[in-house]
């Protein structure tokens, strides 16, 4: 997941701000739900890097390892992964990267306007020469249509939410056929999988953490699964993945 700092650095972060669920300020105080949101787009990266986002315990993700972490730069994370896989003699990593732009009254204030958001992120990603190992995903249909027009070489994945249940309705919002559809796992059924495959679209549901749900999706013959628990996914797919 990509966000942008005040000084236009590309930061790996799910949230556009420091979430009260996990963030600790440089002075050691924890970010609380009642506090004003501290948006990354209003802060230079050297300030962002002083916040800790790893050492607090989590009730949302049981088993989370507690250790000091920062929100890294995307360039550093990608370079580190490329170096690691080469050093270990592993197959090169494939990347499914989300650009977190969205509509809203604070667009252009607390996060960038979508053209700028896309252009800055794609400039970085293309500089890494990842080729067909890169898929860019997004909920924002404005951004997806723009990326398809300006960067036709990209593989794009269309993220849809838990209330998006009609295939024809949400697909009609795009000006093109995406390489991937990424629906909320709860909306995935045999019909949607069949429609995707008939249209030549791969399907990758998000975010399945329950082992029974992971198995249900496997049995539906989805093409990939997004999960917070890769160990559970690997265990469930041991007999399916070569």
Regions found by a protein language model. Name each.
Residues 154-242:
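C-terminal active-site rim and adjoining tail of enzyme catalytic domains
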Residues 14-141, 145, 149-155, 176-177, ...:
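Metal-dependent phosphodiesterase/phospholipase catalytic core, i.e.
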Residues 2-3, 97:
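Conserved metal-phosphate-binding beta-hairpin within the catalytic cores
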Residues 3, 17, 231:
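Catalytic metal-binding/acid-base residues of hydrolase active sites
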């Amino acid at each position: 997941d990509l966000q942008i700092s005040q000084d236009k650095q590309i930061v790996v972060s799910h949230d556009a701000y420091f979430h009260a669920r996990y963030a600790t300020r440089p002075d050691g105080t924890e970010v609380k739900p009642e506090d004003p949101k501290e948006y990354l787009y209003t802060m230079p990266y050297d300030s962002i890097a002083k916040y800790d986002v790893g050492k607090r315990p989590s009730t949302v993700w049981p088993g989370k390892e507690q250790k000091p972490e920062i929100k890294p730069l995307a360039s550093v994370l990608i370079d580190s992964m490329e170096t690691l896989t080469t050093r270990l003699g592993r197959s090169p990593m494939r990347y499914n990267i989300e650009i977190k732009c969205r509509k809203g009254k604070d667009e252009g204030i607390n996060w960038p306007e979508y053209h700028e958001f896309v252009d800055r992120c794609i400039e970085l990603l293309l500089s890494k020469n990842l080729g067909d190992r890169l898929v860019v995903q997004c909920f924002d249909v404005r951004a997806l249509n723009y990326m398809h027009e300006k960067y036709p070489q990209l593989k794009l994945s269309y993220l849809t939410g838990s209330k998006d249940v009609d295939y024809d309705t949400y697909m009609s919002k795009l000006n093109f056929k995406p390489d991937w559809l990424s629906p909320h796992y709860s909306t995935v059924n045999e019909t949607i999988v069949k429609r995707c495959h008939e249209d030549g679209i791969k399907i990758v549901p998000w975010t399945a953490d329950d082992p029974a749900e992971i198995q249900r999706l496997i049995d539906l013959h989805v093409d990939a699964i997004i999960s917070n628990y890769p160990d559970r996914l690997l265990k469930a797919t041991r007999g399916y993945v070569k």
